[in-house]
Amino acid sequence: MNLNELKNDWINDFANPMIIAGPCSAESESQMLETARRLKESGAEISAFRAGIWKPRTKPNGFEGVGVIGLNWLKKVKEEYGFKTATEVANAHHVFAALEADVDILWIGARSTVNPFTVQEIAQALRGTNKPILVKNPVNPDLALWIGALERLLGQGIENVGAIHRGFSTYQKTKYRNIPNWQIALDFKNQFPNIPLFIDPSHICGNRTGLAGVAQEAFNVGYQGAIIESHEDPDNAWSDASQQITPEVLADMIGNLQIRNSGISGYEDEMGKHRTLISDMDFQLIELLSQRMKISEKIGTLKKENNIAIFQPERWKVITEYANQKASETGMSQEFIEKVFKAIHEESIEVQNGIMIDR
């Protein structure tokens, strides 16, 4: 059996879309129960209550989770409010403890997905389970690693799986905590339309303001669910406070989302995917142009300090020849590429002029 042959009927037992919500971290029994109570009373259709029991942190000495005791709090949430429960596992010990506590849904985090040894250890510990196991994309944009993690689960007989798109790390400063890079997620969806795909806007945005927009983009292209961080007192959360929202805000956000019929066929569904890719590429273009202009500023400063003219004909000749060559190789119109590079060059000259006259 391969991944394309999986039926993944498990998701049909949940609402569409399937929303998994709860705090980033389990902090105390009262915090868990209060968040669950407010989620229940908010009116939002929440399929499962999530909470991090063990927290892999970027740096040591941060809050790394309450550990096994938090599993008892998840049990109480299930008993008192009827939610299915979900948590992250990062090694065999976590798996055994979570299974013993009868956690309903487990996920493998982005930092684990990057390491095949870790994924293999987790997969072997999960062998034989019929619980849904979700896999977050790796922190780096590597589709093969993401697919490989799911294949390792399948290799251990685990057939109820799903994928979580949580964005990708970047050294550049952007409006996202983790850039969505929609193209990779949609490549995954195109290869495996049978595997439920969830959006994690909390980790993509890293803030509260962009959550709804990212979630809507995902549902526009047929994602089946979302995993969103919600806390009874977000400002005082012990981890990732800036990206968590109250249950009431979450309910309002979910209520305003437009859920697309994943069964739609034809040009509209395909067009939505293409437009999402174009939007992602446009964002990357703007980011690259911004970086290019910052480098132009540095060059302008050097020219000013060394009394060198802004316009360098030989350099411009090299740029245009290279651009025309690449246009020819890629089948693009040389006239179009010349217009683009002339516009970029003019803006670069304007930037450097500003440096020269201290504007």
Where do the PLM segments sit?
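Hydrophobic faces of well-ordered beta-strands that scaffold small-molecule active sites
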Residues: 17-23, 47-51, 85-87, 106-108, ...
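Glycine-rich, proline-tolerant flexible connector loops at the mouths of alpha/beta enzymes
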Residues: 50-68, 232-241, 299-310
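Catalytic beta/alpha-barrel core
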Residues: 64-66, 83-95, 104-118, 131-143, ...
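Active-site mouth loops of central-metabolism enzymes
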Residues: 17-34, 60-63, 83-89, 109-110, ...
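Extended, charge-rich alpha-helical interface modules
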Residues: 259-359
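Catalytic alpha/beta core domains of metabolic enzymes, predominantly
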Residues: 118-252, 256-261, 265-266
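N-terminal amphipathic alpha-helix/helix-capping segment at the start of soluble metabolic enzymes
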Residues: 1-20, 76
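Catalytic domains of carbohydrate-active enzymes, especially glycoside hydrolases
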Residues: 34-53, 101
